[in-house]
């Protein structure tokens, strides 16, 4: 089979033959429904279809490292670009971080090359080798070690495949007369024997049931490399050739390809899917690190955690921040800060009036207590309110706990509001590109050249970089303990924030012919100042990382 046709790859070069010879042999082959075991058949369909996403199939932890990397030219990473969908700038120190952006087609080629390298040693059918590699998370060394430890039967049993060196029961069953009808054990309809197919385990079902079974497993359950034989209690895995032979829908084939290649990518610590929706590119690095990489689609992200590039905050703290924003922890803080528990039945109570004489509404409790000290109401007297229990230890502890919750809530809201404000402003600044483009056209109509008006685009680029940096500085500051270095950081942050707001104001003004030169000078001066202050802030934070100057609040 020609390896350039579709995505069928032949591993045994000694068995290659011409198209005419192979075509003649296929006509004479009595088992023409069984594909050549030396071929890894992943279908002859387009590998990348923009309209079909894989959703959550890319979630998971990376593990191991495969050796099937190619020799493509590498390009410089990150840098200081930023705007569009990047979410953050690259740090100037990261210019040496080299990476390449691969298509899903190239990833498939890397995967096939990995299988080829292993097969040169163990000499198994390609589809069996692929299942073995998947079992070991595409770690070739671990597979080789287990393969030659002398217990092959145990290895194949763990991987849920039949030892290919044994005679196939399925091929023995294929010798039965094709004229004899037999019932399918799934749909119980009678078909000729030629309409049945099965795996090496010997279980056979009609092709219609096979197709529906595989389609359900792939499209609805998201299973690719772990589809087992449909026979009850049989755990033998379905190989790639069988899947591609029995499925006719190109979308199902495409989804299956994504599932298989996704396993390869997620088990390789040097590969990472681009997190942009409907993007099927993969970034390949020389070594894994928390550095910015940019996909061909324009998305810039952190290779380590997959989030938008988030300098100056580290991945660990950003992960905690995102979780804090997503879960109900701050709802609990609000309840703790604005409500109290009944001292008797512990039901949560919110005060809705000025009187501190509280009566629990729980019909089984109805305790009366003081809102201030949480003590019984009776000792307070009935003539007028006069709480005389401020100094008791239990009341003091209750008030202290409430104050701590209230302070924690206020602190969180302070940083969260500023974080969200810069995030919202960043979205608005992206829309500013269209407005700036119109302004640039207007300025060219006032006798300014195309080169002369490029300062506006540069200013918007810098503005977006500064917004993204400021957004993540509030995450960094939330977990930062107060010390002399944190004061310097906050001063740098305030200076950059003020300059960024001024630059944003300049860009949103209407530009008239009278103020053209004046506003150009102001914009250029301000975006250069913003660039400088942003650089100073990031250099200070990274210097703190290198010298271990930062102390953190464990949340």
From Swiss-Prot:
Annotated source species: Bos taurus (Bovine)
Entry text on domains: Members of the RBR family are atypical E3 ligases. They interact with the E2 conjugating enzyme UBE2L3 and function like HECT-type E3 enzymes: they bind E2s via the first RING-type zinc finger, but require an obligate trans-thiolation step during the ubiquitin transfer, requiring a conserved active site Cys residue in the second RING-type zinc finger. The active site probably forms a thioester intermediate with ubiquitin taken from the active-site cysteine of the E2 before ultimately transferring it to a Lys residue on the substrate.
Function: E3 ubiquitin-protein ligase, which catalyzes ubiquitination of target proteins together with ubiquitin-conjugating enzyme E2 UBE2L3. Acts as an atypical E3 ubiquitin-protein ligase by working together with cullin-RING ubiquitin ligase (CRL) complexes and initiating ubiquitination of CRL substrates: associates with CRL complexes and specifically mediates addition of the first ubiquitin on CRLs targets. The initial ubiquitin is then elongated by CDC34/UBE2R1 and UBE2R2. E3 ubiquitin-protein ligase activity is activated upon binding to neddylated cullin-RING ubiquitin ligase complexes.
Chain coiled-coil ranges: none
Binding site for Zn(2+) 5: 342, 345, 360, 365
Subunit and partners: Interacts (via the first RING-type zinc finger) with UBE2L3. Associates with cullin-RING ubiquitin ligase (CRL) complexes containing CUL1, CUL2 and CUL3. Interacts with neddylated CUL1. Interacts with neddylated CUL2. Interacts with neddylated CUL3. Interacts with neddylated CUL4A.
Location of region: Ariadne domain: 406-555
Similarity section: Belongs to the RBR family. Ariadne subfamily.
Biased composition (Acidic residues): 1-47
Bilayer-crossing regions: none
Pathway: Protein modification; protein ubiquitination
Binding sites annotated in the UniProt record for Zn(2+) 3: 274, 279, 295, 297
Catalytic activity: [E2 ubiquitin-conjugating enzyme]-S-ubiquitinyl-L-cysteine + [acceptor protein]-L-lysine = [E2 ubiquitin-conjugating enzyme]-L-cysteine + [acceptor protein]-N(6)-ubiquitinyl-L-lysine
GO terms, molecular function: ubiquitin conjugating enzyme binding; ubiquitin protein ligase activity; ubiquitin-protein transferase activity; zinc ion binding
Protein name: E3 ubiquitin-protein ligase ARIH1
Binding residues for Zn(2+) 2: 201, 203, 229, 234
Top EC class for this record: transferase
Residues annotated as binding Zn(2+) 1: 184, 187, 206, 209
Residues the record marks as active site: 355
Gene Ontology BP terms: protein ubiquitination; ubiquitin-dependent protein catabolic process
Stretches the record annotates as UBA-like: 103-151
SUPFAM superfamilies: RING/U-box (SSF57850)
């Amino acid at each position: 089979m020609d390896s350039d046709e579709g995505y069928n790859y032949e591993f045994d070069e000694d068995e290659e033959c011409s198209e005419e010879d192979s075509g003649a042999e296929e006509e004479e082959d009595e088992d023409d429904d069984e594909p050549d075991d030396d071929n890894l058949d992943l279908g002859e369909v387009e590998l990348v279809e923009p309209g079909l996403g894989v959703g959550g199939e890319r979630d998971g932890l990376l593990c191991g490292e495969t050796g099937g990397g190619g020799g493509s030219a590498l390009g410089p990473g990150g840098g200081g670009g930023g705007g569009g969908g990047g979410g953050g700038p690259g740090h100037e120190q990261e210019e040496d971080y080299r990476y390449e952006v691969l298509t899903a087609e190239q990833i498939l080629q890397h995967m096939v090359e990995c299988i080829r390298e292993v097969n040169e040693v163990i000499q198994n059918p390609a589809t069996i080798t692929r299942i073995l590699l998947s079992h070991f998370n595409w770690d070739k060394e671990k597979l080789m070690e287990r393969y030659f430890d002398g217990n092959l039967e145990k290895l194949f049993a763990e991987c849920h495949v039949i030892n290919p060196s044994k005679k196939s029961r399925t091929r023995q069953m294929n010798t039965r007369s094709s004229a004899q009808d037999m019932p399918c054990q799934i749909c119980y309809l009678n078909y000729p024997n030629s309409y049945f197919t099965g795996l090496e385990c010997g279980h056979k079902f009609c092709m219609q049931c096979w197709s529906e079974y595989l389609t359900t497993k792939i499209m609805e359950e998201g299973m690719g490399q772990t589809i087992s034989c449909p026979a009850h209690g049989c755990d033998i895995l379905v190989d790639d050739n069988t899947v591609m032979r029995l499925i006719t829908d190109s979308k199902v084939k495409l989804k299956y390809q994504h599932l298989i290649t996704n396993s390869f990518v997620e088990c390789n610590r040097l590969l990472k899917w681009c997190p942009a929706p409907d993007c099927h590119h993969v970034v390949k690095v020389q070594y894994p690190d928390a550095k910015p990489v940019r996909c061909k689609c324009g998305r810039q992200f952190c290779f380590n955690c997959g989030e938008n590039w988030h300098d100056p905050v580290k991945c660990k703290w950003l992960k905690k921040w995102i979780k804090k924003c997503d879960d109900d922890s701050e709802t609990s803080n609000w309840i703790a800060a604005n409500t109290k528990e009944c001292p008797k039945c512990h039901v949560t109570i919110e005060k809705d009036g000025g009187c501190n004489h509280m009566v629990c509404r729980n019909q089984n409790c109805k305790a009366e207590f003081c809102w201030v000290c949480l003590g019984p109401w009776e000792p307070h007297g009935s003539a007028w309110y006069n709480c005389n229990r401020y100094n008791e230890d239990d009341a003091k502890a209750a008030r202290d706990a409430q104050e701590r919750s209230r302070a924690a809530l206020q602190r969180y809201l302070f940083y969260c509001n500023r974080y969200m404000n810069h995030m919202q402003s960043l979205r608005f600044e992206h829309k500013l590109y269209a407005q700036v483009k119109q302004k640039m056209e207007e300025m060219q109509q006032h006798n300014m050249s195309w080169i002369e008006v490029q300062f506006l685009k540069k200013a918007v680029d810098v503005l977006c970089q500064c917004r993204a940096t400021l957004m993540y500085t509030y995450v960094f500051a939330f977990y930062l303990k107060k010390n002399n270095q944190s004061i310097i950081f906050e001063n740098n942050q305030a200076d950059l924030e003020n300059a960024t707001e001024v630059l944003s104001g300049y860009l949103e003004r209407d530009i008239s012919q009278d103020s053209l030169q004046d506003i150009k000078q102001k914009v250029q001066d301000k975006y250069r100042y913003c660039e400088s202050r942003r650089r100073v802030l990031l250099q200070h934070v990274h210097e703190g990382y290198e010298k271990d100057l930062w102390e953190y609040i464990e949340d």
